Amino acid sequence: MKDLAQIMQQAQAMQAKMAEVQQKIENTEADGVAGAGLVRVKLRGKGELISVTIDKSLMGDDPEIVEDLIKAAHSDARKRLDQAMEDAMKTATAGFGGMLPGFKLPF
């Protein structure tokens, strides 16, 4: 029975840690850049777009170029955000000794 109690304690500790990580992920921000810094976007948490900044020098250019740069900057920010979330999850689950091998969370 001691093993079961220990497993339950580990599960409760993991649940608390996962709630903490979820909050951290929701507050994490990532910047994406395209066109050598001419277009920047900022994302939060699960991909919420916070801001778009476009250098004034692009305003007279072809709108399709600006649209492509916005997409590229968004993609860059998304990749950075995904990496930050992955790093946070690795840190959060490191102390559980492989208790959940191959387990992926939906965020």
Swiss-Prot record:
Binds to DNA and alters its conformation. May be involved in regulation of gene expression, nucleoid organization and DNA protection. It is found in: Cytoplasm, Nucleoid. Its main location: cytoplasm. It comes from Hyphomonas neptunium (strain ATCC 15444). Homodimer. Keywords: Cytoplasm, DNA-binding. HAMAP family: DNA_YbaB_EbfC (MF_00274). Belongs to the YbaB/EbfC family. GO terms for cellular component: bacterial nucleoid; cytosol. This is Nucleoid-associated protein HNE_0371. InterPro entries: YbaB-like_sf, YbaB/EbfC. The keyword Cytoplasm applies. It comes from the Bacteria. GO terms for molecular function: DNA binding.
